[in-house]
Amino acid sequence: MTRKILVTSALPYANGPIHLGHLVEYIQTDIWARFQRLRGHDCHYVCADDAHGTPIMLKARERGITPEALIAEVGEEHQRDFADFLIEFDNYHTTHSDENRYFAELIYSRLNQAGHIDRKVIKQAYDPKLEMFLPDRYIKGECPRCGAEDQYGDSCEACGATYTPAELKNAVSVVSGERPVERESEHYFFRLQDFEAMLREWASPEHLQAEVANKLAEWFKEGLRSWDISRDAPYFGFRIPDTEDKYFYVWLDAPIGYMASFKHLCERKGLDFDDWWGPDSTAELYHFIGKDIIYFHALFWPAMLHGAGFRKPTEICAHGFLTVNGQKMSKSRGTFIMARTWLDHLNPEYLRYYFAAKLSASVHDLDLSLDDFTQRVNADLVGKLVNIASRCAGFIHKRFEGRLGETLDDPALYRQFTAAGEHIAELYEKREFSRAMREIMALADQANQYVDEQKPWVLAKQEDQADRVQDICTQGLNLFRVLVVYLKPVLPRLAADAEAFLNLPEQCWADAKTPLLDHGIRKFKPLMTRVDPDRVQAMLEDSKKTLQPKGEPQAAEAGPLTSDPIAEQIEIGDFAKVDLRIARIEQAEHVEGADKLLRLQLDLGGETRQVFAGIKQAYRPEDLEGRLTVMAANLKPRKMKFGVSEGMVLAAGPGGSDLYLLEPHQGAQPGMRVK
């Protein structure tokens, strides 16, 4: 039965280029959508640029252009990069569109009429020079708790404290350098708590991965709160109906971009929008997203849709983050790789295959190990897959005028290959791509083993074995064709080249069941070359250059004491007041809604403490668990908006990704005092 499937990826923000971290999601989604089409389903894949918000407005101002000009320029770059990575959208749009304005206003109006929108006055930081309210990230100053300088307006990267911009000492606007003042403003809030019963029922394994469903259970336990959906002028976005200076917050109209892009497709293709988005739609709707935006997609988005009379998603498909060589992407190491830099040096299908070989249906992070990448692509795609065709095609072309035989040498082996198709299809369907790639490469091993055992190059020297040679090579090329069909969602360009070589029209999944017999093929040309390690290294070097700041060469960086001099002297008794203890990190996890914090559960040797640490940009939670560190154990517990922090872990470094937790030497035990 043909299914109706609509697939989306999260919208890339329109103020910068696409990098490999972004591509994890778009490649994953594209593979899944291509697979559905290959199976004969009516599948549409839409996306758009997320084109609103303060960062876009300020970047355009900095460059002396309009926001519209900036998003148009970035949008063209995004679409070029996606096209060159063979991401096949049915429609790519922008949230700065008539369709998006229409749906944003419609959804807001329906929610407002139903009583799900509140208004209340809040206090915010205001830049008197630019005459604009400032998001927390655009305010910096000294932490009111530990005194660390150059901290953002919502939390301290040094000690993990959270606070309001008004509490920040010596605060300045990052944009103008002026000291912000506090002003009141009326904001609009979406009453998420009105939909708790519906969300609890919807948030099941049918719609969410188990890890995500468990996370939602935690949020339900904490209680759902109203969500601020408005921003004050000046702001680049859509004005809220019946207001003079209030705009929809970017996170309200961003997911609505899925609807807007599909509406744009409907207008181009003559599709019925309500068949896909109406409350009684039988179509399937899948959102592929990163695990950092689950709150928006698994709570706010289905609540907005339900409250406005639209259907809810069939499934939210979350994935983890990308690391390179086991570490966060790094500009200094050249591993913060832009899509265009990769394309300048390497085949995009190399990366598509490697990501597929590592992706599963879980939210675990994915590591791009460049040594493993080189070895795996060369072994699997060149040494196994393409090798089958190159070993057999020459005999068919030279000895049999490019014509396959009328029979297979081993029909049972061919049936084994085609029978594997349903299991491989199940793995694709479940987004278990890594398992699918292993199954396909196991078949490729069998195909190569078959050719090795039959030795057509030996038989070709015997005149009475000509028919057998033709049948063996016909068998090998048919096995190759089956594998290409199975890999077509991952390697669309190689598949198209293979179809041309085999003199075939575009293949679908079902075509693999029928062998090619008594069929003319074209002369074989190499379908893929080996990854050259020198080109990988050149790409890394280019990444370093691409990300270097422009302008005059900078003087050598001063040492830490220059920018952060030693504090005033204290008495030994002052230091003795701080009780430093060894602690083992039992558990570490992201804090939803916090850009810089991790929640740590620390074992003090008989007592467990919860600490919020501003180290999210420097460490992955799974890398911390089980490690020893040092904590200040006698600090008064501090109530934060995410919970109570019962101490502080110690780290060195200026902040951000350059933070280094203190670790004791071997032999130290949890609870030991640091003297």
Curated annotation (Swiss-Prot):
Co-factor remark: Binds 1 zinc ion per subunit.
Which superkingdom is the protein from? Bacteria
- According to its UniProt record, which protein family does this protein belong to? Belongs to the class-I aminoacyl-tRNA synthetase family. MetG type 1 subfamily.
Q: Which GO terms describe its molecular function?
A: ATP binding; metal ion binding; methionine-tRNA ligase activity; tRNA binding
Known role: Is required not only for elongation of protein synthesis but also for the initiation of all mRNA translation through initiator tRNA(fMet) aminoacylation.
Enumerate the cofactors the protein uses. Answer: Zn(2+)
- Span of the annotated motif 'KMSKS' region: 328-332
Q: Which residues bind ATP?
A: 331
The keyword Nucleotide-binding is annotated on this UniProt entry: yes
Identify which top EC class this enzyme belongs to.
Answer: ligase
What subunit structure does UniProt give?
Answer: Homodimer.
Please provide the record's keywords in A-Z order.
Aminoacyl-tRNA synthetase, ATP-binding, Cytoplasm, Ligase, Metal-binding, Nucleotide-binding, Protein biosynthesis, RNA-binding, tRNA-binding, Zinc
Report the subcellular localization.
Cytoplasm
Q: Where is the tRNA-binding domain?
A: 574-675
- Indicate what this protein is called per its UniProt record: Methionine--tRNA ligase
EC numbers = 6.1.1.10
* GO annotation terms (biological process): methionyl-tRNA aminoacylation
* GO annotations of cellular component type: cytosol
Find motif ('HIGH' region) and give its ranges.
12-22
Query: So where does Zn(2+) get bound?
Result: 143, 146, 156, 159
Reactions catalysed according to its record:
tRNA(Met) + L-methionine + ATP = L-methionyl-tRNA(Met) + AMP + diphosphate
Report whether Calcium shows up as a keyword of the record.
Answer: no
Q: Which InterPro entries match?
A: aa-tRNA-synth_I_CS, Anticodon_Met, Met-tRNA-synth_bsu_C, Met-tRNA_ligase_1, Met-tRNA_synth, Methionyl/Leucyl_tRNA_Synth, MetRS_core, MetRS_Zn
Known PANTHER family for this protein? METHIONINE--TRNA LIGASE (PTHR45765), METHIONINE--TRNA LIGASE, CYTOPLASMIC (PTHR45765:SF1)
